[in-house]
Swiss-Prot record:
This is Lactoperoxidase. Ca(2+) binds at D227, T301, F303, D305, S307. It comes from Capra hircus (Goat). The lineage of its organism: Eukaryota, Metazoa, Chordata, Craniata, Vertebrata. Residues 22-117 form a propeptide. The gene is LPO. The modification Phosphoserine is found at S315. Residues 1-21 form the signal peptide.
């Protein structure tokens, strides 16, 4: 009996050993399979990235780069962003290969070790990229270490947050509209360009201006957006689908998702079958892998921190500084001056798309904390103002504190400029965007809350594009009497994309600043949504190349990002969810528009968030409808309350410093950093010269005496 018992124990032990050995072998085999798959994909993706870079450089060296190549210059991922996007692409392609080459039944098959896959790819865990100093009074450049409990929260090169689960054709990455016969909620999605043509476009520019908002109101929105989010495009994943095939032949595949032209589109005669469109960069999923759906990257910090001035990567931040000076200054242009005032330095990476715009002027693009700084001339103008203000602050702080070294001067000036952007945005800008909804969504500040998630949400990147409806068709330059400046005082918008030469060699920024103050934004109108300058001539700075359609790009990008439809977001915000023409008509207060939308989408559930949100009537005293007020208000409240370095958070500034900061204004920024001497007191409101303008001596100055240290 005892012998039998020992034999049973022995046999059981052998069986357990065999199972354990089998598991070990299977695990080793699984690890080897993962390693092999990742290795092959890395080779393929690295080649795609290198080929893309080489091709772009070659194209910009040619005499006739395309619209696509000009815009790609600004959307091209660099540095750590490039690495994060490349890892995301390797992760996704490796997963596809493992599904294809192994017995995996689906991507969530428990036999696949997702942690092992992530480490093999190089994704790692979401940990800070810098060492956190909990006692530092200054933000990190990357946005890491803001939240002490979760130091990577809000940092650059992380995924945009999802407030609702992503919606893709396959549940993972394929956008709706990719597969021709695939439906969404029982209906095929309309072509993005068709929606643009039938809903967004208009011909007559008469009566489109906003009688209550200055052009600066529009421009500040773009500044804030560029401070908060940026999703560069990814590269194509394989040699089968090159960018040439995407751009020239409209061949859909990998990350090429061309915007096809509908029948009778006028662009069919001049631009072939499509506008090329490359999908946004995305990052690796993170543990515990509850969702493997593609999540797009935010390449900049989620905080309102002037990252567009200083950068979101340490290497860039360092290049932007004048490290040879002990004054904490930002580097400025050494080749050109604006009547004694500084310009941003040129980005001397050759070739430059800005030089292509005027081949005889030889003026490159500017370098700034955000790569998009030279996309259009008014954006470059405000970048110039912010750069000058940093250096003005640093010099004044040095005068007050001669013993401060360059690093302290830089950090203190950076901190003040960050507070300036926060104050202007929340005190002056958001109240006239959200109108009567302001207090509902952004109540008075109650202090920092480390449980609030400050990350920019994916949907916000579409909600904030309401500003595209505010862009007028022309840009005006005005003289010191606010009269037309020079023989070409009013210029079509499309001639000012990538146009730095007009600043450097044709008048400086003062005439443009006066235009921002005295001219008006466009008013969003349900019948006149986006000017043709953006809808047909985007990134068409010369007659040699054909323009893009920003509205169609926005709609295609909604699908690229896996955005839930209009009604999902209405439900998220506690608003009604119309199901019929009558219901949609009641929400939009416009039967014709409601019918046009349903003729295209068939159901309100499928309406893309960008067009659905912008189609709503504006709230009282605001410039967005109820849905966008909810999405924007919620996001800005989280940006504020989840930021440990928010200017009002006790301990960030002293009480006297906070009192002083409350006097900042955009008008004073102009007075201190240009030769403009007459400004309005309320720069975002529509102003008529001379009635609404005052001398700069009547505008409060920022008193920096509270920054004088006691050692003095």
């Amino acid at each position: 009996m005892l012998v039998c018992l020992h034999l049973q124990v022995f046999l059981a032990s052998v069986a357990l050993f065999e199972v354990a050995a089998s598991d070990t072998i299977a695990q080793a085999a699984s690890t080897t399979t993962i390693s092999d798959a990742v290795s092959k994909v890395k080779t393929q993706v690295n080649k795609a990235f290198l080929d893309s870079r080489t091709r772009l450089k070659t194209a910009l060296s040619s005499e006739a780069p395309t619209t696509r190549q000009l815009s790609e210059y600004f959307k091209h991922a660099k540095g750590r962003t490039r690495t994060a996007i490349r890892n995301g692409q390797v992760w996704e392609e490796s997963l596809k290969r493992l599904r294809r080459d192994t017995t995996l039944t689906n991507v969530t098959d428990p036999s696949l070790d997702l942690t092992a896959l992530s480490w093999e790819v190089g994704c790692g865990a979401p940990v800070p990229l810098v060492k956190c100093d909990e006692n530092s009074p200054y933000r990190t450049i990357t946005g890491d270490c803001n939240n002490r409990r979760s130091p990577a929260l809000g940092a650059a090169n992380r995924a945009l947050a999802r407030w609702l689960p992503a919606e893709y054709e396959d549940g993972l990455a394929v956008p709706f509209g990719w597969t021709q016969r695939k439906t969404r909620n029982g209906f095929r999605v309309p072509l993005a360009r068709e929606v643009s043509n039938k809903i967004v476009g208009y011909l007559d520019e008469e009566g489109v201006l906003d009688q209550n908002r200055s052009l600066l109101f529009m421009q500040w929105g773009q500044i804030v957006d560029h401070d908060l989010d940026f999703a560069p495009e990814t590269e194509l994943g394989s040699s089968e689908h090159s960018k040439v095939q995407c751009e020239e032949y409209c061949i859909q595949g990998d990350n090429c998702f061309p915007i096809m032209f509908p029948k009778n589109d006028p662009k069919l005669k001049t631009q072939g079958k499509c506008m090329p469109f490359f999908r946004a960069g995305f990052v690796c999923p993170t543990p515990p892998y509850q969702s493997l759906a593609r999540d797009q990257i935010n390449a900049v910090t989620s905080f309102l921190d002037a990252s567009l001035v200083y950068g979101s990567e340490p290497s860039l931040a360092s290049r932007l500084r004048n490290l040879s000076s002990p004054l904490g200054l930002m580097a400025v242009n050494q080749e050109a001056w604006d009547h004694g005032l500084a310009y941003p330095p040129f980005n001397n990476v050759k070739p430059s798309p800005c030089e292509f715009i005027n081949t005889t002027a030889h003026v490159p693009c500017f370098q700034a904390g955000d790569s998009r700084a030279s996309e259009q001339i008014l954006l470059a103008t405000v970048h110039t103002l912010l750069l000058r203000e940093h250096n003005r602050l640093a010099r004044e702080l040095k005068r007050l504190n001669p013993h401060w070294d360059g690093e302290m001067l830089y950090q203190e000036a950076r901190k003040i400029l960050g507070a300036f952007i926060q104050i202007i945005t929340f005190r002056d800008y958001l109240p006239i965007v959200l109108g009567s909804e302001m207090q509902k969504w952004i109540p008075p500040y109650q202090g920092y809350n480390n449980s609030v998630d400050p990350r920019i949400s994916n949907v916000f990147t579409f909600a904030f594009r309401f500003g595209h409806m505010e862009v007028p068709s022309t840009v005006s330059r005005l003289d010191e009497n606010y009269q037309p400046w020079g023989p070409e005082a009013e210029l079509p918008l499309h001639t000012l994309f990538f146009n730095t030469w007009r600043i450097i060699k044709d008048g400086g920024i003062d005439p443009l600043v006066r235009g921002l103050l005295a001219k008006k934004s466009k008013l969003m109108n349900q019948n006149k949504m986006v000017t043709s300058e953006l809808r047909n001539k985007l990134f068409q700075p010369t007659h040699k190349i054909h323009g893009f359609d920003l509205a169609a790009i926005n709609l295609q990008r909604c699908r690229d990002h896996g955005m839930p439809g209009y009604n999902s977001w209405r439900g998220f915000c506690g608003l009604s969810q119309p199901k019929t023409l009558k219901g949609l008509q009641a929400v939009l207060k416009n039967k014709i528009l409601a019918k046009k939308l349903l003729d295209l989408y068939k159901t309100p559930d499928n309406i893309d968030i960008w067009i659905g949100g912008n189609a709503e009537p504006m709230v009282e005293r605001g410039r967005v409808g109820p849905l966008l007020a909810c999405l924007l208000g919620r996001q800005f409240q989280q940006i504020r309350d989840g930021d440990r370095f928010w200017w009002e958070n006790p301990g960030v500034f002293t009480e006297k410093q906070r009192d002083s900061l409350q006097k900042v204004s955009f008008s004073r920024l102009i007075c201190d950093n240009t030769h403009v001497t007459k400004v309005p007191l309320h720069a975002f409101q529509a102003n008529n010269y001379p009635h609404d303008f005052v001398d700069c001596s009547a505008v409060d100055k920022l008193d920096l005496s509270p920054w004088a240290s006691r050692e003095n």
